[in-house]
C-alpha cells in the first residue's frame, strides 16, 4: 500500500499482492493504537471505507472539534419520493445520526419515528419529491467514493439532488450521456 506517512487507505482484495516485505517499518504499540483509533473515526465520518488520498486531511477531520467538523464536511442535500424516504428512514445505520437530517413525515403518515432519529426538516407538501434529506460527509466521500455515489445515484428518478452543485452537475451530465447513448443506438 502507500508510503505516505499517516495515510489510511483501503484497497480491493483482488488488487492485493505481496511484492516484498518491508521490515524497516514497524509501528510502536502507541502508533498502532492511534492508527486504529483514526481508522474507526474515519469509517464513522465517511460511512464507508474510502478515506481519500491525503493524510493531512484525514488527520484534520479526526482531530476536529464538533464545530470545526461542521465546517470541514460537505453537505449533500436531496429530496426523495415516499418510496425512498420510507426505505432511508428505516435504515439509519449507514451514516452517523449526528451528520444526518431527515424530513419530518407528511401529515397523515402513521410512522413512529425513533427517539434518536434526526427528523427535523420540513417536507414539501404537494411535491413529487417532498422529503428533504441532508448528510454531512468528508469532501473525498462526496467527490470520489464509488460506494456512496452508487448508493446516491442508484435511486435514479426517485431522488432530486440539490447540493453540492458539483454533484448536481455530474448527475445532469450522466443523464445527458445516457440519453445520447440510448437515442443513438436506435
Placement of each model-derived feature along the sequence:
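Short, acidic/hydrophobic/Gly-rich beta-strand patch recurrent on exposed beta strands
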Residues: 1-2, 151
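Flexible linker/loop signature enriched in Pro/Ser/Thr and Pro/Gly
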Residues: 2-50
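Polybasic (Lys/Arg-rich)
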Residues: 44-186
Amino acid at each position: 500500500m502507500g508510503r505516505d506517512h499517516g495515510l489510511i487507505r483501503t484497497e480491493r482484495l483482488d488488487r492485493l499482492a505481496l511484492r516484498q516485505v518491508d521490515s524497516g517499518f514497524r509501528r510502536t504499540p502507541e502508533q498502532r493504537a492511534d492508527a486504529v483509533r483514526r481508522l474507526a473515526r474515519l469509517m464513522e465520518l465517511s460511512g464507508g471505507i474510502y478515506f481519500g488520498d491525503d493524510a493531512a486531511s484525514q488527520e484534520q477531520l479526526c482531530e476536529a472539534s464538533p464545530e470545526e467538523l461542521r465546517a470541514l464536511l460537505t453537505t449533500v442535500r436531496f429530496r426523495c419520493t415516499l418510496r425512498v424516504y420510507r426505505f432511508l428512514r428505516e435504515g439509519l445505520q449507514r451514516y452517523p445520526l449526528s451528520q444526518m437530517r431527515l424530513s419530518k413525515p407528511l401529515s397523515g403518515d402513521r410512522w413512529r419515528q425513533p427517539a434518536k432519529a434526526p427528523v427535523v426538516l420540513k417536507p414539501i407538501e404537494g411535491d413529487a419529491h417532498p422529503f428533504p434529506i441532508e448528510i454531512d460527509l468528508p469532501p473525498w466521500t462526496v467527490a470520489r467514493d464509488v460506494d456512496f455515489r452508487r448508493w446516491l445515484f442508484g435511486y435514479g428518478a426517485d431522488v432530486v439532488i440539490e447540493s453540492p452543485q458539483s454533484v448536481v452537475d455530474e448527475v445532469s451530465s450522466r443523464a445527458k450521456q445516457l440519453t445520447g447513448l440510448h437515442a443513438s443506438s436506435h
